[in-house]
Curated annotation (Swiss-Prot):
A motif ('KMSKS' region) lies at residues 253-257. PROSITE patterns: AA_TRNA_LIGASE_I. It is found in: Cytoplasm. The gene is gltX. This is Glutamate--tRNA ligase. A motif ('HIGH' region) lies at residues 12-22. ATP binds at residue 256. InterPro entries: aa-tRNA-synth_I_cd-bd (IPR045462), aa-tRNA-synth_I_codon-bd_sub2 (IPR020751), aa-tRNA-synth_I_CS (IPR001412), aa_tRNA-synth_I_cd-bd_sf (IPR008925), Glu-tRNA-ligase_bac/mito (IPR004527), Glu/Gln-tRNA-synth (IPR000924), Glu/Gln-tRNA-synth_Ib_cat-dom (IPR020058), GluQ/Sye (IPR049940). One of its GO terms (cellular component) is cytoplasm. GO terms for molecular function: ATP binding; glutamate-tRNA ligase activity; tRNA binding; zinc ion binding. GO terms for biological process: glutamyl-tRNA aminoacylation.
Amino acid sequence: MAANEIRTRFAPSPTGYMHIGNLRTALYTYLIAKHEDGKFILRIEDTDQERYVEDALAVIYKTLEMTGLKHDEGPDVGGPVGPYVQSERKGLYLDYAKKLVEKGEAYYCFCSKERLDILKTNSEALKRPFKYDKHCANLSKEEVQEKLDAGVPYVIRQNNPTTGSTTFDDVIYGRISVDNSELDDMILIKSDGYPTYNFANVVDDHLMGITHVVRGNEYLSSAPKYNRLYEAFGWNVPIYVHCPPIMKDAHSKLSKRNGDASFQDLIEKGYLKEAVLNYIALLGWNPEGTNEILSLEDMVKLFDYTHINKSPAVFDPVKLKWMNGEYVRKLSLDEFHKAALSYYDGVITKENIDLKKISELIQTRVEIFSDIPEMVDFFNELPDYDIEMYTHKKMKTNPEISLDSLKNCLPVIENIEDWNLDNIQNTIMNYIKDLGVKNGVVLWPLRTALSGKKFTPGGAFEIADIIGKDESIRRIKIGIEKLEK
């Protein structure tokens, strides 16, 4: 590790799910490192074995790969300070915890579950947060050794002072002081020999040379305890960047427990990965200037973590949809068509329909790809529709006028020999000109008959071109039949 090198880490738990908040943490962590040409490290925090989900690692790797957040060190690529999976480092945490015991900064706790349950019940009755009562901190060395020799199960707890205060600095929230009387003696090593998340991440951050720690502000309350661990070991404290939460609305946080979308959910709904990443970057950070459409390279160049907002960010699906639309329009026609193909699948089954023409027609109108099936299904099959759709105040049409228009227009369409967009358009526009009526009087009924829908991508000419001459004539005749009833 080079001296003065910026080193950040993304340290997810393998729970099989990449929450939007987790992805933002990964992104900000990546941007802090890359803005300074530093190293971005992936570490897997799997100390909570009960929450471990099979194949969860694959979700993490796939998400980072898809979003372009390439890690410099990690379980799959190695590096100078591995292993990068906490369960593979299990042995070293106990050694560090024992060092704290020797210094009087931690102690063995042999309390039974029953005793702890009584303490918790008493705390609840007094409406106070649970705080361990330091019962085992008062055991003599001999008593401790006797219990260890007898194989009594134990945990190792941090030994926090009960007087004075602990102060720490955070980039976003500034200097924060906490009364030591509020600090619980948190568990460092669990009875199964595994370290707790709180202990392992401090040890690992030090051993891996992490200079900046990015995490959610729900960890602010734990920061004083982390600081005391750094000080107890005589280690440098990293720069803390506690990010505000991402809210679903004014009252509730975005949460996987409430079924809120994960990154993968958004991709499956038809959002582009670049748009999602761009949108997530702006949930708490605003670059200078008005441009909100930013590539990952732009973000690396512009990102300044000292400008992250303190107030919570609200996840706005409407804004995300708009931003996705901006990215969709930036695609080349070939790129758009390739992405759209799976959404045509099973919706458009007729072989004579040119899907590329549909792609060309809808690209500027699509915001998310999952909108496509409902937008294009009428090309394949004319839906049943109400004749009231022929009434349009602005176009000055109603069922009677529409019936006349379709009847008069049908032979004109039947006589078009070379069926292509230009020919269809020129023939019908010349017919309207000769008729001396407003365009809408003919085109509104025609588009309605051809599509059976109130809103369509493209107008009558484009629809007729795509569905073909025979199908166009068939649909116009259905329209006439409906209007004659």
